[in-house]
Amino acid sequence: QPGDYTIIKPRWSAFFQTELDLILRRLDVRTVILTGTTTPNCIRTTCYDAIALEYNTVVLTDCCSSHTEEIQRVNLEDMARAGAILMDSASFADYGPGTVEDLSAAIRARMLEEDTVPEPFRSEDGQVFWPDLW
């Protein structure tokens, strides 16, 4: 479609050596929905990178695949333990993207409530930064 972005990824993760993170942040996207083939490779590495970059990460379980059901199950369980939200495409279609909890916002709200907001830090050139990527 006109205006759509095309990203060519050189490795398994869609974030590795691409501009995906920059594009998503500029568009204020905070949730990524993962689908595709070879769950243990492309889906899993993209999932871990998305979580590390503080995106709410959803894996549509019936829209990705592995060589065997056992490999698929184990990889999905591992991604869930890392923080991914697992759901099937019917559930996602029924509820839509607006129902995916904004985990980053919830963490920031709890930090403010508990007065545990991290202190800002200074870079070597004197600029002040907050640990929050958003």
Task: State where each predicted segment sits.
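Active-site-adjacent betaalpha module
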Residues: 1-109, 119, 123, 129-133
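Major-groove DNA-recognition helix of helix-turn-helix-type DNA-binding domains
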Residues: 113
